Amino acid sequence: MYDVQDIKVYRNVLVLLEPLQRLASLIPRSDSRLKIQLLNAGRSVPAQIAEGFAKRRSQKEYRRFLEMAIGSSDETITHLRIIQLAHFPQVKIETCAALIKQFTIISKQLNKYIQAVSKNIPRSDI
């Protein structure tokens, strides 16, 4: 039986949540709202993929959730860029840059996955 964990982009984004959490823990308490927004956006990417997967009987509904996942990935990138610009003493710019690169890859993978879903191509390797 096909499971959401069979989807490569889903597995890839789950791996990024730990370094995202580590980075968020370095954000000063005075910017706790930014920390919460970063974590909420990052965590919503796999959640939206999973929710869409559960509704995959309707291709339109599935695509809608995947498109929301791209939006959340892009929102995560924006929060990471804001963190870079804030120059928090404990946060390394290189760490932000690496996560930005990885979430950019996630957004691209999701876009390819949406194209595959639209064409009914087997999707486990995307």
Predicted regions and their residues:
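Short, C-terminally biased terminal segments at protein or domain edges
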Residues: M1-I49, R56-I126
